[in-house]
From Swiss-Prot:
UniProt keyword terms in alphabetical order: Hydrolase, Nucleus, Protease, Repeat, Thiol protease, Ubl conjugation pathway
InterPro entries: DUSP-like_sf (IPR035927), Papain-like_cys_pep_sf (IPR038765), Pept_C19_DUSP (IPR006615), Peptidase_C19 (IPR050164), Peptidase_C19_UCH (IPR001394), Ubiquitin-like_dom (IPR000626), Ubiquitin-like_domsf (IPR029071), Ubl_USP48 (IPR044743)
Chain ranges of the Ubiquitin-like domain: 961-1037
EC number: 3.4.19.12
Record carries keyword Membrane: no
Top EC category: hydrolase
Biased segments, Polar residues type: 402-417
Protein name per the record: Ubiquitin carboxyl-terminal hydrolase 26
Organism from which the protein derives: Oryza sativa subsp. japonica
Region of interest: Disordered: 1-21, 384-419, 948-972
Gene Ontology annotations of biological process type: protein deubiquitination; proteolysis; regulation of protein stability
Active site per UniProt: 115, 359
Gene name tied to this protein: UBP26
Basic residues composition-biased segments: 1-12
């Protein structure tokens, strides 16, 4: 059973009565009449209306498939793209920045590197007492103090703005802060409170005037006590104010230990004894800090950074540090009290490993409901009842407590560099938290009533000051209006999109006209596609308020203003109903109906079609004649010259309906500049004779003007001028060929490039290897290349350039000697050094190149009396030791240990050569961003192949094989280095790539170990392309390369801090200075 034929199942069956366009045009040409059936065939009206094609078919004017996507389909752009993409094109939606409610805190914009200020401002704002103090300021005071004014406005917006985040730019600009420089948040808080304290002192409102001192200021005293008499020093009674307590955390695990360390007693003994006024002598004593009073809000500054004297930089301490949810500070006072219990109210966090970079966020507790919030610039996240987020499996309205005596506690973990957990506790029901990034802790005193029960004494008067109400309302109104305008704009646009889609679907549904319909209209496919696919079609005209596109049918019109059959693939056949819908709305045109087919174009098409058939048939009939002409078989009769390459290409071209540009100029390549026939031996002038019939066809279809075509009958004579010129050139080439042949024969061994066997006692002459290489290439060039290579430089000029003017000695050395199998030769080179030639060759060179025989550079092979003598001879060129074999050793033994070397006349000028080589070496070592290769060797010793590659001397401009860089084991790396790169920097690169700490790296070039970390690669003669190898000694433990880089920074920028801002002006200047010294 045969299988069904499925190869053409996707093709539409052609109607039985359909003729090909070529047949229809032939009929029109022969009869001169155009029938209705002919129009249906040529305009493809007969094709059925299709449904469900994969794409729009150009071959059918009745196909409207693919102009819009399928049902529920989308496109990447235009009218049919996804709705969210259309909305995105309208611009950002301001409603996305809408604040849920005033119960949800608002964020602050980061202007580049102002996260340190944002975090502090959020901590201050969330402190209700501080916020009320700022809100109670008089308008006159705000006008007098711009910083207070901007702070109050910022707090007012954080309080009542409808936006989810507030622009902090006006406040930052007023403080004159550089928003591109990261600063220390602790330093900012200290200076900012000092600035506020001075500005607030002008207020007459008691709650505002001393709000900073009341909330944040406590007092301490430094007590020095004599161990002999037990008396305190006079200075011990002096109390000093503090706004935060700076606690060490290095080597300490929790807040209790840090407080113990802060209040610990220091012994003054030995050389550090104290002079007691009472005892009137130096005695042992103790010194400690005593807390005299505590403010309602205690700020603990954790010293996360340590100073590295070696690099004058700061390094962050990233160890975990624990702190409690409640803290009893009463026992820490010099006069203990039970009413000083503090609750954790804010945590300032520094994310990042470096001291001068990273990011600040704040976790702050809402005093009104106990909820914790994370403030990360513009983003504010609810954390629940725990400062680092809710516990797994616990509801947000319950805290986790353990009874007295419990040994463990549940853990709360935050993996975002904050590793927070609850630690063990034994004395009270409390929570402990731990963080590797906590930078500052804020604790607020817990108020208790007379019965000892915690009370919330937050004032209910938390409304916005009246002088900010109008401003905030105006801002909110403007913002709400902006949101409403956007929503309105979006609704209008989406309604328009929906309307346009319905319109397109409606028109395209009605668009197809059946083949039987006599009334239809033509429309440009390009315009229809753009109209169906674009939101706003191009070429606008205004109708009402919406811009529409007028119909443009000009691309499918012929010069007679009608519809040509040749444009049928660029237009569609619309039903009358669909056309009237489009035309009534968009206008334009011109209107092209079913009666607007072009009779003139149809007749021209019929004529051209017949002409194409004639051209195709004539060319096919003449192909055999052209093939015979190329084979040299021409019939009797007149013959004409054409270009042989041209005719070959003419035969290879595929059959086409009309002549192409390639058919022009069958004799152009045969025509000289004088308009005559080129001699056949001229370049590109190969020709062939063709019969007259073929020539006339080529002549008529050449596409050139009649006057531009040059005809050459077979009896045409070549151009006399060109023939004479070619004869001269041929004569010169013949003479040159003879000269080169003679030199090749005279210098047969030298031409072959074989090494010359050298014998002691014979006289030789020296020629530059580079000149000899050029001469060899010159005399061996034959055929078409005989005159292409230039003649080498004059030998006399070359010889003269080898003599230094200062000492009249040689500026180059002879090539090294090689002794193999008892024969002495020179090392081969095409570029460097001097090559020795025989005396006979030099005599011939003297005659051939017109050089005086006496100008030759003489050389001979001599033997040293001893190896030491050889090394001391400046003009001696020793043999290569690595090329010695057994025969050489035997020869050396026969000569009593003497070695051969080259003695020259004149002598080699070692002084000038040394100076030249030094300059070349310096230039070569002054490289930038070049590649070197480093191999990791495992085992006691590097393989021989790596050692040899590492010890090899790099050749200038040598092409390095790419294969040498490939490795399957991953033990080879390519590094970009410069001559100024230090060995230390190179070891860091190897550390980063291969993971070997620099102390364990045994780095070699060849067999020599590379030491001295401060030396440069130029100092160690490491060139571009060198191969190094490294071995891991495994003596020292692995560590992070980031630690090494941070500790070894050479360039350290001076920290400017807040210099040049309002924070360091007048009253704050001395405080800033004190902070700098303490750091």
């Amino acid at each position: 059973m045969s299988r069904p034929n499925t190869r053409n199942k996707s093709k539409r069956p052609r109607a039985d009565d359909c003729e090909s366009p070529s047949a229809v045009f032939k009929k029109i040409h022969s009869t001169g009449a155009i029938t209705k059936g002919d129009i249906k065939q040529l305009y493809m009206v007969w094709k059925p209306v299709c449904h469900g094609c994969h794409g729009n078919s150009k071959d059918s004017p009745n196909c409207f498939c693919g102009l819009i996507p399928a049902a529920n389909g989308v496109r990447k752009s235009g009218l049919w793209q996804r709705t969210n993409e259309i909305i995105r094109a309208l611009g950002p939606n301001p409603s996305t920045d809408l604040r849920d409610s005033t119960e949800t805190p608002a964020g602050l914009t980061n202007l580049g590197a102002t996260c340190y200020a944002n975090s502090i401002l959020q901590c201050l704002y969330m402190n209700t007492s501080f916020r009320l103090g700022i809100f109670s300021l008089e308008p006159d005071i705000l006008k007098m103090h711009p910083v207070l004014d901007q702070l109050a406005r910022l707090f007012a917006q954080l309080h009542s703005s409808k936006m989810a985040f507030i622009d902090s730019a006006p406040f930052i600009k007023t403080l004159e802060l550089d928003n591109g420089v990261q600063q220390d948040s602790h330093e900012f808080l200290t200076l900012f409170l000092s600035l506020l304290e001075g500005s607030l002192s002008h207020s007459k409102v008691p709650g505002a005037r001393t709000i900073v001192q009341h909330l944040f200021r406590g007092s301490v005293s430094h007590v020095t006590r004599c161990s002999s008499c037990g008396r305190d020093s006079e200075a011990s009674s002096k109390m000093e104010d503090f706004y935060e307590l700076e606690l060490n955390i290095k080597g300490l695990n929790n807040l209790e230990q840090s407080l113990d360390d802060y209040l610990s007693t220091e012994a003054l003994d030995g050389e550090n004894q104290y002079f007691c006024e009472s005892c009137q002598k130096r005695v042992d004593a103790t010194r400690c800090i005593k807390l005299r009073s505590l403010p309602p809000v205690v700020n603990f500054q954790l010293k996360r950074y340590v100073f590295l004297p070696k690099t004058t930089t700061k390094k962050k301490i990233s160890s975990a540090f624990s702190f409690p949810g409640q803290l009893d500070m009463g026992k820490r006072l010099s006069n203990p009290s039970s009413s000083y219990t503090y609750g954790l109210s804010a945590i300032l966090i520094h994310k990042g490993s470096a001291a001068n970079s990273g990011h600040y966020v704040a976790h702050v507790k809402d005093e009104s409901n106990g909820q914790w919030w994370e403030f990360d610039d513009e983003h504010v996240s609810k954390l629940g009842l725990h400062p680092f987020g809710e516990k797994p499996g616990k509801s947000s309205d319950k805290t986790d407590q353990k009874p007295q005596g419990s040994s463990t506690a549940d853990s709360v973990t935050n993996d975002d560099n904050n590793s927070c957990h609850e630690a063990a506790f034994t004395s009270t029901m409390e929570e402990m938290f731990s963080s590797t990034d906590a930078y500052m802790l804020m604790y607020k005193r817990i108020a208790k009533d007379e019965n000892g029960i915690e009370s919330n004494n937050i004032s209910s008067n938390n409304s916005l000051p009246h002088h900010f109400v109008d401003e905030i309302d105006e801002r909110n109104t403007s913002y709400v209006k902006e949101c409403e305008e956007y929503e309105s704009k979006k609704d209008v646009h989406l309604a328009y999109i929906t309307e346009r889609r319905q319109e397109v679907k409606s028109v395209l549904t009605e668009a197809p006209a059946t083949p039987e319909e006599d009334s239809y209209f033509w429309i440009s496919t390009d315009w229809l596609r753009q109209w169906a696919d674009n939101v706003n079609p191009p070429s606008p005209i205004i109708t009402g308020v919406r811009v529409h596109s007028s119909i443009d049918n000009s691309p499918i019109q012929c010069e007679h203003g009608k519809v040509p059959a040749s444009k049928v693939t660029s237009m569609k056949r619309l039903s009358a109903g669909a056309w009237h819908k489009l035309f009534s709305k968009y206008g334009g045109g011109p209107t092209l109906s079913s009666d607007d087919f072009c009779m003139e174009c149809l007749k021209d098409g019929a004529k051209n079609s017949v002409s194409a058939d004639v051209y195709r048939d004539r060319k096919a009939s003449l192909r055999s004649i052209a093939e015979a002409a190329l084979a040299g078989n021409n019939p009797d009769g007149p013959l004409y010259f054409v270009s042989r390459p041209w005719l070959t290409q003419w035969l290879r071209r595929k059959n086409v309906d009309i002549p192409s540009d390639a058919d022009s100029g069958p004799t152009i390549a045969l025509t000289c500049t004088h308009g005559n026939l080129l001699p056949e031996h001229a370049s590109g002038a190969k020709r062939v004779t063709v019969p007259e019939d073929l020539w006339l066809f080529l002549y008529e279809t050449s596409g050139m003007k009649i006057d531009d075509i040059v005809t050459f009958p077979s009896d045409s004579q070549p151009c006399g001028i060109c023939s004479q010129q070619l004869s001269v050139v041929a004569s010169v080439e013949d003479n040159l060929r003879a000269v080169k042949l003679k030199q090749r024969q005279s210098h047969e061994k030298l031409t072959s490039g074989k090494s010359l066997a050298l014998h002691p006692g014979q006289k030789y002459y020296l020629v530059p290897s580079s000149w000899l290489s050029e001469w060899r290439a010159y005399i061996t060039a034959t055929g078409k290349n005989i005159s292409s290579l230039p003649e080498p430089q004059s030998l006399e000029v070359t010889i003269n350039s080898l003599i230094c003017e200062k000492h009249s000695r040689l500026l180059q050395r002879p090539l090294d000697l090689v002794c193999k199998r008892g024969t002495i030769t020179q090392k081969a080179s095409n570029t460097d050094g001097l090559t020795m030639i025989s005396e006979s060759d030099w005599i011939l060179f003297s005659e051939e190149w017109n050089v005086a025989h006496g100008k030759g550079l003489c050389a001979e092979i001599v033997f040293s009396k001893s190896s030491q003598d050889n090394l001391q001879s400046s003009e001696a060129v020793p043999i290569l030791v690595e090329d010695l074999d057994q025969s050489t050793n035997d020869l050396s033994n026969d000569l009593g240990g003497r070695e051969p070397y080259v003695r020259t006349d004149p002598e080699v000028c070692e002084e000038c050569i040394g100076e030249k080589e030094s300059c070349a070496l310096v230039e070569k070592l002054n490289y930038q961003n070049e590649d070197i290769q480093v191999y990791l060797v495992r085992g006691k010793e590097a393989p021989k192949s790596i050692r040899e590659a590492s010890a090899a001397v790099p050749v200038p401009d040598r092409r390095t094989s790419k294969r040498s860089r490939r490795t399957t084991s991953g033990n080879s790396i390519s590094l970009k280095v410069s001559g100024s790169t230090t060995v230390y920097q190179l070891k860091l690169m190897i550390w980063e790539s291969l993971g070997i700490v620099k102390e364990n790296q045994e780095l070699h070039k060849g067999s020599v170990e590379i030491e001295d970390d401060f030396a440069t690669l130029a100092d160690k003669c490491i060139f571009p392309g060198d191969v190094l190898w490294v071995k891991d000694s495994e003596i020292y433990e692995n560590r992070d390369i980031a630690d090494e880089i941070s500790e070894q920074k050479v360039v350290v920028q001076t920290e400017e801090g807040f210099r040049g801002t309002l924070l360091t002006s007048s009253a704050s200047a001395q405080l800033c200075q004190d902070i700098s010294f303490s750091d």
